[in-house]
């Protein structure tokens, strides 16, 4: 289905970020870098940048696919720590059909719960 293809497209890109994160973890614990604090700091910086890039990719994916049932799923799964106001912007951008879907409703409930917890 169209949604399955969108999810596969998203997962393909995210898996590259995950692989890169694993590479950084492996490099961080490589014996030849363990005693080199400059190298360790550089690896940590690259690792943090990779996390930010994945997060930004996820946000962009959601914002650029408001007509996909995958968008609210990705928002709940990967950008749940986003500011509630931004999640609200994401939700309002969804098409009515997507907003009324299982994950659209779950996203709305999550936002409402977060707002009431503030």
Model-found features: residue ranges?
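Short amphipathic alpha-helical coiled-coil/interface segments
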Residues: 40-58, 91, 111
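Charged, long alpha-helical assembly modules
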Residues: 56, 63-118
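Charged heptad-repeat coiled-coil "stalk" segments of single-pass membrane proteins
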Residues: 4-11, 52, 66-67, 74
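Short helix-to-loop capping/linker segments positioned immediately adjacent to catalytic or ligand/cofactor-binding
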Residues: 29-31, 58-63
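A non-transmembrane, solvent-exposed segment enriched in polar/low-complexity residues
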Residues: 1-46
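Sec/Tat-exported extracytoplasmic proteins
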Residues: 14, 18-21, 25-28, 54, ...
